[in-house]
Amino acid sequence: MDNDSQYSGYSYKSGHSRSSRKHRDRRERHRSKSREGSRGDKSVTIQAPGEPLLDNESTRGEDRDDNWGETTTVVTGTSEHSISHDDITRITKDMEDSAKLDCSRHLGVVIGGALALLSFLTPIAFMLLPQILWREDLEQCGTACEGLFISVAFKLLILLLGSWALFFRRPKAFFPRVFVFRALLMVLVFLLVVSYWLFYGVRILESRDKNYQGIVQYAVSLVDALLFVHYLAVVLLELRQLQPQFTIKVVRSTDGASRFYNIGHLSIQRVAVWILENYYHDFPVYNPALLNLPKSILSKKMSGFKVYSLGEENTTNNSTGQSRAVIAAAARRRDNSHNEYYYEEAEHERRVRKRKARLVVAVEEAFTHIKRLQDEDQKNPREIMDPREAAQAIFASMARAMQKYLRTTKQQPYHTMESILHHLEFCITHDMTPKAFLERYLGPGPTIQYHKDRWLAKQWTLVSEEPVTNGLKDGVVFVLKRQDFSLVVSTKKIPFFKLSEEFVDPKSHKFVMRLQSETSV
């Protein structure tokens, strides 16, 4: 496997003679041969296909020339990655955690499904058991009794559809704690069904009641009770949270991006899931490359002083006073870092405007060329291209401008060539304008717009001083953490407003003109 690795080459600059260069080449070849035996012990990272050619660190550099795409040497190969012992341990731990989460999630679904099936089949069992056990002793079921069968059938159908719509939905997240209201409803349904079964066993099964119409009415009463429980579930799980009661502020810890939301009565863990749902389409994508100051500012270091006392002991006080004076004078010196930052920002904005103008012109020309090809294709059917071929045909004319603009705005890690081609094909297919194509690249879009590998976190951690099953209260603060940043959430209760009414008589709107000697009428 190691022998299959290919290196693009190295460039050497030297002022020595040709013989010394040949000697150095032979020495390098000898060293490379001696390292072949131990090459398997070193980790070599090979860029996977489809990934951007620049990592996060390289995209931050501003000291590269504009022709980096033509002069950069890239090592290509298969998508092989090195894995250390720590990586294997971490992967094993993640697999164990995910297995625990899946088991607990499926356990709740199984319990809920079993309870729902028991509740649905219980009324049917109430009506079938007398027909099976003591059919000969039962009284005849009249017209009213037969009408109850229709009532039970439709009520069970409504209950089945309502339960499926409310409870059997795909879960949006895994909660760290039990959903209190849902668990309360499950306990209530369980107690209700068990109570009905106990009464049915004592008063009907043991005595073998002959009044079949009364048995059917008993089953109808259970179905009615289940319908009322379903109505209670709709109120507690859906309607209770619709009335806004709190205003929450969500701040991203790294760049300070913030949003405000109004929300109703929910537990902390459900609020956390609701915030994550809104985060992915409200917050711009997190780009760590935009957080750094220019290198010219970061490279500046504060001057340091070290004062030595070379005199006698009685001169200690004098040397201490002199050192303090020197340090104070250095501290009073004016720091010009803010000026450098200002000019760096101005230069960056100028470059962005310049690259943006070139990109807009290149895209406009490319789309105009596509329109001209479409008009010609109507006359020459043999030259018709599909959207993919058309996108590949015009991409070369805008690739350089797109590359420079994405690098200047530090968006290149989020847009691969394949994703740009796919978006261009989409725009051509639906007859979208150049502005519609550029909308994705001229500014940072919402997080969910990008590929999942760039924004989707496998797991968020909820950090809260309050129990996560508690409801929101005024002043509650909790944090949603992931590997590279966190969301800090603070809560404020919506104030109570008191309105007073003041009646104004329409007849009271009367005015008098005040005439003065200078007034012109």
Swiss-Prot record:
During gastrulation, broadly expressed throughout the marginal zone and animal cap region. From the neurula stages, expression becomes concentrated in neural tissues, in the neural plate and neural tube. Keywords: Cell membrane, Developmental protein, Gastrulation, Membrane, Transmembrane, Transmembrane helix, Wnt signaling pathway. Belongs to the Vang family. It is found in: Cell membrane. One of its GO terms (cellular component) is plasma membrane protein complex. Residues 130-147, 200-218 are extracellular. This is Vang-like protein 2-A. One of its GO terms (biological process) is establishment of planar polarity. Pfam families: Strabismus.
